[in-house]
């Protein structure tokens, strides 16, 4: 039997696999790339463990895990299957079949639209929203609004990485947790 690995050691390992690309996508930006962690099987398992353990402790009442288009999808299914919960996607406009609700939100370079299938979340269901990154908070604010439109209740927003200097957390109501802060 191998020794148990602490959450801190798991997190350090995941951090070591996150790529850094200066001046991408434009001059002056340091892009942190989660895909480096996802291509490493051990880092991927550790990341799943950290997210699942956090929800077990912080939001045990959760019934649905929602992932945001597109990197949030990489995590919500992993979490939901491990916890035996439902999962639902929030997608960009025009990507979901059936009846949808939508909300527009501001990006630093314009406006975009998120959509959610009306049947994905039942009124009163408790939801954890998962994404890879919290920057300005615009996408998580929009997701929370969208979930509210179908009667869901966001109990927590959970992200892998947070860019603290952009202060996106200040725009969000309710619990917010990030595994890694830059």
UniProtKB/Swiss-Prot annotation:
Chief location: cytoplasm
One function term, GO molecular function aspect: adenine binding
Catalyses which reaction(s): AMP + diphosphate = 5-phospho-alpha-D-ribose 1-diphosphate + adenine
Family: Belongs to the purine/pyrimidine phosphoribosyltransferase family.
Entries under InterPro entries matching the protein: Ade_phspho_trans, PRibTrfase_dom, PRTase-like, UPRTase/APRTase
EC number assigned by the record: 2.4.2.7
UniProt-listed HAMAP family: Aden_phosphoribosyltr
The entry's keywords: Cytoplasm, Glycosyltransferase, Purine salvage, Transferase
GO cellular component, one term: cytoplasm
Protein species of origin: Drosophila melanogaster
Assembly and binders: Homodimer.
GO biological process, one term: AMP salvage
Annotated function: Catalyzes a salvage reaction resulting in the formation of AMP, that is energically less costly than de novo synthesis.
Subcellular location: Cytoplasm
Pfam families: Pribosyltran
Top EC group: transferase
Gene name for this UniProt entry: Aprt
Gene3D superfamilies: 3.40.50.2020
Protein name per UniProt: Adenine phosphoribosyltransferase
NCBIfam families: PRK02304.1-5
Pathway connected to this protein: Purine metabolism; AMP biosynthesis via salvage pathway; AMP from adenine: step 1/1
């Amino acid at each position: 039997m191998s020794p148990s690995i602490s959450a801190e050691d798991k997190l350090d390992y995941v951090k070591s696999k996150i790529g850094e690309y200066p001046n991408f996508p434009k001059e002056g930006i340091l892009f942190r790339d989660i895909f480096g962690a996802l291509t490493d099987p051990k880092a991927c398992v550790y990341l799943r463990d950290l997210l699942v353990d956090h929800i077990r402790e912080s939001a045990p009442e959760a019934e649905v895990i929602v992932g945001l288009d597109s990197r949030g999808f990489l995590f919500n299914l992993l979490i939901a299957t491990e916890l035996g919960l439902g999962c639902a996607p929030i997608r960009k406009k025009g990507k979901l079949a059936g009846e949808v609700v939508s909300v527009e939100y501001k990006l630093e370079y314009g406006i975009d639209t998120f959509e959610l299938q009306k049947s994905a979340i039942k009124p009163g269901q408790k939801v954890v929203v998962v994404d890879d990154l919290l920057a300005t908070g615009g996408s998580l604010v929009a997701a929370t609004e969208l979930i509210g439109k179908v009667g869901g209740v966001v109990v927590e927003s959970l992200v892998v990485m947070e860019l603290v200097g952009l202060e996106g957390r200040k725009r969000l109501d309710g619990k917010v947790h990030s595994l890694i802060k830059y």
